[in-house]
C-alpha cells in the first residue's frame, strides 16, 4: 500500500498543475502515459471495481463469431452464441492454460485448444477431452467436464458496448 500512497501523491501533485488556471497549467508528464508503475496503480484504482467497455456487439454480428482481445493483460474472447447471446470468457484452456483463439474468427461452432485438442462449445462448455484417459480413451473419472468449462467473465451490453 505504501507504493500506492507514493503514486497517489505524485498524481495529485501533477493534477494540480493540469487543473491550474489556464495560463499556469501544464500537461501531465510523459511518464504518466508510459510508466508501468502508474498503469498498475490505475488498474487497481480505476478499472478493478468499475465496468469497462471492451468491445461492441457489432464486432461479432453473427452466431459463431469470436473476438479475441486482451484487457488489462487478461486474454479474453467475446462470443456470439447459438442463442444469439453475447458472452465473455477467459481465452485460456482449462487444461494447461494455452491461449485458445489467437485472432478474431467468424462462424465457429467450437473452440479447440491447439495444445491437447480439448474442445469447447461457443457457449464455453467443455465438450471433449481427447485421450485424457490414455490413447483412445476420451474420458477419465477425475475429469468432470461440467466443472471445466471456460471461465465466464460477467458482462453486460449497453448501447452495443460490451
What are these regions (language model features)?
Residues 21-22, 28-71, 76:
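Non-catalytic accessory segments flanking enzyme active sites
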Residues 60-162:
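Rieske [2Fe-2S] iron-sulfur-binding domain
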Amino acid at each position: 500500500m505504501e507504493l500506492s500512497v507514493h503514486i497517489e501523491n505524485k498524481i495529485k501533485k501533477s493534477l494540480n498543475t493540469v487543473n491550474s488556471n489556464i495560463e499556469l497549467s501544464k500537461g501531465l508528464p510523459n511518464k504518466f502515459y508510459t510508466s508501468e508503475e502508474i498503469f498498475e496503480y490505475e488498474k487497481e484504482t480505476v478499472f478493478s471495481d468499475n465496468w469497462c467497455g471492451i468491445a461492441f456487439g457489432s464486432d461479432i454480428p453473427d452466431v459463431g463469431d469470436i473476438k479475441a482481445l486482451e484487457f488489462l493483460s487478461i486474454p479474453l474472447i467475446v462470443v456470439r452464441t447459438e442463442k444469439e447471446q453475447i458472452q465473455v470468457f477467459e481465452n485460456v484452456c482449462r487444461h494447461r492454460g494455452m491461449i485458445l483463439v489467437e485472432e478474431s474468427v467468424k462462424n465457429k461452432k467450437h473452440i479447440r485448444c491447439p495444445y491437447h485438442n480439448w474442445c469447447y462449445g461457443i457457449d464455453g462448455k467443455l465438450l471433449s477431452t481427447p485421450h485424457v484417459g490414455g490413447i483412445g480413451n476420451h474420458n477419465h473419472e477425475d475429469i468432470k467436464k461440467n466443472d471445466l468449462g471456460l471461465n465466464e467473465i460477467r458482462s453486460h451490453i449497453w448501447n452495443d458496448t460490451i
